[in-house]
Regions:
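A conserved beta-strand element that flanks and buttresses the S-adenosyl-L-methionine
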Residues: 31-32
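Short alpha-helix
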Residues: 84-101, 107
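Short, glycine-/aromatic-enriched active-site segment of Class I SAM-dependent methyltransferases
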Residues: 65-84
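Core SAM-dependent methyltransferase catalytic element
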Residues: 99-134
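Conserved beta-strand signature within the Rossmann-like core of class I S-adenosyl-L-methionine
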Residues: 57-65
Length: 134
């Protein structure tokens, strides 16, 4: 629907299972809105998207328009219907990303939102990122 509403926006909309499917091509930006808790392999998935699908300098945004506490509580109520894992405190999640060599440009969480902005800074995979995803 979005691609029909904005046909000349210079944006390519892709709907995919980013854990299972390989995305074709590279992008300047990837937005993962309200999906991160549903990843079974969150660090591996993000590492693969950053290294395989972002141009150098490209950014990947993990975004939620609710707090971590609200999201975790909601997912507990519907755990029999959909897979979701608890969101970690944003600083802990960022530490997992930086531990394997990913570059985090900014991050924050409040009682209204949760986000992490990653950026691809190099052309080559670091050994730790490669080990995490391959």
């Amino acid at each position: 629907e979005a691609s029909l509403r904005f046909p000349n926006a210079g944006v390519r909309f892709v709907r995919a299972d980013v854990e299972r499917d390989r995305l074709g091509g590279r992008f300047n930006a990837i937005l993962l809105y309200s999906v991160f808790p549903h990843f079974r392999y969150p660090v591996d998935t993000i590492a693969r998207l950053v290294t395989d699908n972002l141009y150098c300098g490209g950014r990947l945004l993990i975004a939620h328009s609710q707090s971590r506490e609200q999201l975790n509580e909601m997912h507990k109520r519907i755990s029999d219907k959909v897979f979701a894992r608890d969101l970690l405190p944003v600083a802990e999640q960022v530490a997992q990303f930086t531990e394997i060599g990913l570059s985090v440009a900014s991050f924050d969480e409040t009682d209204e939102y949760y986000y992490i902005l990653l950026q691809r800074v190099g052309r080559k995979l670091s050994a730790s990122v490669a080990d995490a995803i391959y």
